[in-house]
Amino acid sequence: MLIVYYSLTGNVKRFIQKTKYTNTLTLDQAEGINEPYIIVTGTIGFGEIPDPVRQFLDRHSANLLAVAASGNRNWGQNYARAGDLISSTYHVPLLMKFELHGNDNDVKEFNIKVEEISEYHTRETVQSY
């Protein structure tokens, strides 16, 4: 499964590096992709989607399968809210939220949920033939 990520402060990049996935691209590297992917992003300001992520999704949302978001619990209701906004705007599941660069349990949860999405997508693709 392809993981596309945006890491303004480095937290999301550190999280991605701890997962078992090697098929990962930054937003810049993913420009022009034409395959299913999961996006992982941080949240900026008062619970907003970073502009580069919004612009990327405006061009490439057709293959978006799910989202995961990083945030800081100090922001209360705005914690990792970019994930909520992407999920509702693009009608994809929010896999999870994790704080800053995540902990070991977050990494395990992410790995499991990405596998579930990947298996579901594979079944749906096979059944459509």
Curated annotation (Swiss-Prot):
InterPro entries, alphabetized: Flavoprotein-like_sf, RNR_Ib_NrdI_bac, RNR_NrdI
GO molecular function: FMN binding
Superkingdom to which the source organism belongs: Bacteria
Any Gene Ontology biological process: protein modification process
Pfam families cross-referenced by the UniProt entry: Flavodoxin_NdrI
SUPFAM superfamilies with a match to the protein in the record: Flavoproteins (SSF52218)
Function as written in the Swiss-Prot or TrEMBL entry: Probably involved in ribonucleotide reductase function.
Protein's name according to its UniProt entry: Protein NrdI
Annotated source species: Macrococcus caseolyticus (strain JCSC5402)
Gene: nrdI
